[in-house]
Amino acid sequence: MALTLSFSLPLPSLHQKIPSKYSTFRPIIVSLSDKSTIEITQPIKLSTRTIPGDYGLPGIGPWKDRLDYFYNQGKNDFFESRIAKYKSTIFRTNMPPGPFITSNPKVIVLLDGKSFPVLFDASKVEKKDLFTGTFVPSTELTGGYRILSYLDPSEPNHEKLKKLMFFLLSSRRDHVIPEFHETYTELFETLDKEMEEKGTVGFNSGSDQAAFNFLARSLFGVNPVETKLGTDGPALIGKWILLQLHPVITLGLPKFLDDVLLHTFRLPPILVKKDYQRLYDFFYTNSANLFIEAEKLGISKDEACHNLLFATCFNSFGGMKIFFPNMLKSIAKAGVEIHTRLANEIRSEVKSAGGKITMSAMEKMPLMKSVVYEALRVDPPVASQYGRAKQDLKIESHDAVFEVKKGEILFGYQPFATKDPKIFDRPGEFVADRFVGEEGEKLLKHVLWSNGPETESPTVGNKQCAGKDFVVMVSRLFVTEFFLRYGTLNVDVGTSALGSSITITSLKKA
């Protein structure tokens, strides 16, 4: 949905090595006298296991796994059943889409918080053309360019393009808070009006429009509603993203139709060619200052524009489209007590800041910050990460060591890694104050939504999300703005192709 240069959010120092209660150590206690005891820990040597699982017969195995993943079991049961079968959080399987879109669906799955971080180690894994998994969407959907998200840090263009994204974020930092306030005040006014008229209101459509308007206004200095694009942005982006992600999503159609339509053959890029051109024209017209910086970095205007479009529409808008409804769902389910605590904390700090939302004021809201981190832990906007082993590796789970051969593809499903019961208490629950206090803050290194630990920062040498701090900031702004205006809410939750579908059934103003 990534930022270090100017939106860097201060965190306590978490880089010192503090033994976790889950570390694989056996204590040895030596008594020297009646008054002194020395506790020495020694690591337990884990046994080496062959990676369990198999890929089945060519063609048939990948197809069967695809049907299980999407229809017969669903994602969670797909992984849980294999953990139980193999008695391991690391195993071999096929990942969609399989035939006939990808020639090699074979992966090694990592489903625990100990093994998962290897996917962030640029010295051990390569990220080239693995952003969407075992298949790569046609570059016809991105102007003929391999976009930043598909580049490995070792590729020359990676550094140039990531620097451009850092520049975009840092150069517009002063516009984020005021534009967010204006845009989301408009959204809340629309929700209020519809609630008065109908008694309930759908959240997703208005949230999508607000997200796109905010990104355009804050990062590019233009309100899209006042341009030729009008209010069409979210719909155009939705169709364009569908053409890229259809092999790994389901639309809820009848099983056979859904599988044949989405997972068997690539949909032709020509279906969204005119839509994409409208988006491209919008960004090209409003990126003059960014093109100057791009040319300094050795990037052409055309390549810069396609990358800016992708970063804004796919990464940022796509992330907000998925995450904001999921976060609101979790907050609603947290109940009135948490809502009251949030409202009191937020209103008190904003009042102390002279009635304005500031970065400093938000830093003094520990519960609000924890709620955002917990939402990112429970429902990360990007659930899957991939990497290709650069060399023969040994990867540890909590229970064993596994040997991986050079060239094998590693796949991590983050909602399992960030709900690891050996790291988190009540891992499947949304615990609003989980990250409050010194002990809570120590757990932030296990929040991994940004393609890296929350305690680390994006650089040109890694694949951590360039807008990491930006995403955290706008998520905090959403919670802060919401509880300045409202006291509590109730929602009904449905499903959508990307995330949750939210209907607000009650909304109490402050």
UniProtKB/Swiss-Prot annotation:
It holds the Pfam family p450. (13S)-hydroperoxy-(9Z,11E)-octadecadienoate binds at N315, K321. Expressed in flower buds, leaves, roots, stems, petioles and cotyledons. Not detected in ripe fruits. Expressed in sieve elements. The keyword Iron applies. It comes from the Eukaryota. GO terms for biological process: defense response; jasmonic acid biosynthetic process; oxylipin biosynthetic process. Its EC number is 4.2.1.92. The keyword Cell division does not apply. Heme b binds at K127, H158, K162, K463, C465. One of its GO terms (cellular component) is chloroplast inner membrane. It is an enzyme of class 4 (lyase). Keywords: Chloroplast, Fatty acid biosynthesis, Fatty acid metabolism, Heme, Iron, Lipid biosynthesis, Lipid metabolism, Lyase, Membrane, Metal-binding, Oxylipin biosynthesis, Plant defense, Plastid, Plastid inner membrane, Transit peptide. It is a peripheral membrane protein. Disulfide bonds: none annotated. This is Allene oxide synthase 2, chloroplastic. The gene is AOS2.
